[in-house]
Amino acid sequence: MAKDTTGRLRVTVKTGGKRKLSSKLWLERQLNDPYVAQAKRDGWRSRAAYKLIEMDDKYHFLKPGLAVVDLGAAPGGWSQVAARRVGAVDGKGKVVAIDLLEMPEIVGVTFARLDFLDADAPEKLIAMMEGGADIVLSDMAANTTGHRKTDQLRIIGLVESAAAFAADVLRPGGTFIAKVFQSGADADLLVQLKRDFRTVRHVKPASSRQDSSERYVMATGFRGTPAV
């Protein structure tokens, strides 16, 4: 074991057998990530839970009694946080979640295995919600091709679809948060969000890996109807 720049012991993984270099690097990153270890100790499904916790601690949008939609929920870190903070675990608030992958049950969360981009997915989600939403969360990420420009366009297209859904289901004053990547390709998205919401900002939580271009667009104060 070696020490990293903070003085912590760093775990290294040997490449052997059928393990690819990319798998080795991913495993090393997981083993040396303090948020991964902390998530296990705190009972969160993933390190992503801390990103939502940080954002809510600062901006206070997850309030008791609110209804939340979590798009791209698996393995469930964000759904866990949302369910606790809006009181869904006690039947006060509501959390509805979907993902392409199966997700083990979480107390207070209604889950369906759905592809958000399927034509009938929004209708199914609305039926699950049994009413409007106060918050739409999206930690979805498109499959990457390795071609940077193509990947940027894919993720922006996914976020634009999530934003359009949010505009259909959010109650006035609602909040929309989605994962994006710093690229400059989201100019049109920001224009639309600024029409529909009173405040739009980019947020990069401390728990988001610093070597990643990942950040979140946070739109608050939904106007109720798009501004003309």
Swiss-Prot record:
Q: Which family does it belong to?
A: Belongs to the class I-like SAM-binding methyltransferase superfamily. RNA methyltransferase RlmE family.
Localization recorded for this chain is: Cytoplasm
**Gene source species:** Nitrobacter hamburgensis (strain DSM 10229 / NCIMB 13809 / X14)
Which GO molecular function, any one, fits this protein according to its record? rRNA (uridine-2'-O-)-methyltransferase activity
Enumerate the HAMAP family for this protein: RNA_methyltr_E
User: Recorded E.C. number(s)?
Assistant: 2.1.1.166
Please state what the protein is called: Ribosomal RNA large subunit methyltransferase E
Q: Name one Pfam family in it.
A: FtsJ
Please verify whether the record's keywords include Cytoplasm.
yes
What is this protein for, i.e. what is its function?
Specifically methylates the uridine in position 2552 of 23S rRNA at the 2'-O position of the ribose in the fully assembled 50S ribosomal subunit.
Q: Does the keyword Transmembrane helix apply?
A: no
Enzyme class at the top of the EC tree? transferase
Which InterPro entries does the entry mention?
RNA_methyltr_RlmE (IPR050082), RNA_MeTrfase_FtsJ_dom (IPR002877), rRNA-MeTfrase_E (IPR015507), SAM-dependent_MTases_sf (IPR029063)
**Cellular-component GO terms for this entry:** cytoplasm
Q: List the PANTHER family hit by this protein, alphabetically.
A: RIBOSOMAL RNA METHYLTRANSFERASE, RRNA METHYLTRANSFERASE 2, MITOCHONDRIAL
What's the superkingdom here? Bacteria
Keywords for this entry? Answer: Cytoplasm, Methyltransferase, rRNA processing, S-adenosyl-L-methionine, Transferase
Which positions are catalytic residues?
Answer: 179 (proton acceptor)
Spell out the reaction equation it catalyses: uridine(2552) in 23S rRNA + S-adenosyl-L-methionine = 2'-O-methyluridine(2552) in 23S rRNA + S-adenosyl-L-homocysteine + H(+)
